[in-house]
């Protein structure tokens, strides 16, 4: 497996990668993902998350690679939807810049597929993706304040934190706490 280190917004690098490899499809996971950080630095999120998609799809179009799987997010769903969410639930009306970048990227890709039927586009919308390599060299191990639930759980499990705090007591559940589904 070849490894290229770079920025997805680097058009020359992307052209080189496509020229040196036979690429049939792209799985687009590149992007910044911390909701709180996106509120503090919205320009950074719009620049990185949207421009990376625009540059990537421009180069893909040029080389004739028209299959992409995009790592979106459940943050694209509107807050006024009935639960549980469905794929057909209303999107937009996002509450933070991170969500808006995912929503806008979906709109860009959907527009491309509408304009050119040769494009095959898959949008994955999920909640709190996590994972790590068995070696521990890559994965969720934040040194600062975690950005989602799973790093808190792992920090409690390894003894870095004494306990896990659960916030909220007014959710529509039998005990008022939030319910999350996890898939392994």
Spell out what each predicted region is.
Residues 2-25:
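Conserved Rossmann-fold cofactor-binding substructure of NAD(P)-dependent oxidoreductases
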Residues 4, 19, 46, 122, ...:
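Conserved Rossmann-like nucleotide-binding pocket used by diverse enzymes
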Residues 26, 68:
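Receiver (REC) domain switch-region micro-motif
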Residues 30-33, 72-73:
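Conserved NAD(P)H cofactor-binding loop of Rossmann-fold oxidoreductase domains
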Residues 34-38:
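Serine-hydrolase catalytic-loop signature spanning alpha/beta hydrolases and amidase-signature enzymes
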Residues 40-58, 62, 66-67, 76-128, ...:
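Catalytic helix-loop patch of NAD(P)-dependent Rossmann-fold dehydrogenases
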Residues 110-184:
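NAD(P)-dependent short-chain dehydrogenase/reductase
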């Amino acid at each position: 497996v070849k490894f290229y280190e770079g920025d997805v917004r680097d058009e020359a690098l992307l052209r080189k990668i496509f020229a040196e490899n036979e690429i049939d499809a792209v799985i687009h996971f590149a992007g910044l993902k911390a909701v709180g950080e996106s509120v503090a630095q919205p320009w950074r999120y719009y620049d990185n998350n949207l421009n990376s998609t625009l540059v990537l799809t421009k180069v893909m179009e040029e080389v004739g690679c028209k299959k992409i799987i995009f790592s979106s997010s459940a943050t694209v769903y509107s807050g006024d939807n009935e639960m549980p969410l469905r794929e057909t639930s209303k999107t937009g009306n996002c509450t933070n810049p991170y969500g808006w970048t995912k929503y806008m990227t979906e709109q860009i890709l959907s527009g491309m597929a509408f304009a050119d039927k040769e494009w095959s586009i898959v949008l994955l919308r999920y909640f709190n993706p996590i994972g790590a390599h068995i070696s521990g060299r890559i994965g969720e191990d934040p040194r600062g304040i975690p950005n989602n639930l799973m790093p808190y759980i792992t920090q409690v499990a390894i003894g870095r934190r004494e306990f896990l705090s659960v916030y909220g007591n007014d959710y529509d559940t039998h005990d008022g706490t939030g319910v999350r589904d996890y898939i392994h």
